[in-house]
Design a protein with these regions (language model features):
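C-terminal alpha-helical interaction appendages
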Residues: 1-71
Length: 71
């Protein structure tokens, strides 16, 4: 992964993480044929959810497919 010298604020990182989470939860619900709400509950109970909001991991920069593969 290419890194830049730009320093993102925590607010920007959070915005990216929330957007990524929404897209990933939607993909999870389609993949597993479950409701969005059920997918959200499952996802937020996972270790990946915690890692997503640990900005030091850099996962907030990735794609929904990448995150779903980690899940």
């Amino acid at each position: 992964m290419e890194t830049s010298n730009y320093n993102f604020t925590d607010s920007q990182k959070e915005s990216c993480a929330v957007s990524l989470m929404r897209d990933t939860v939607e993909a999870l619900s389609l993949r597993d044929n479950i409701s969005y709400e059920e997918a959200l509950l499952r996802f937020t109970s996972s270790k990946i959810y915690s890692a997503l909001f640990d900005y030091d991991t850099g996962i907030w920069r990735e794609s929904p497919d990448y995150l779903l593969n980690l899940y």
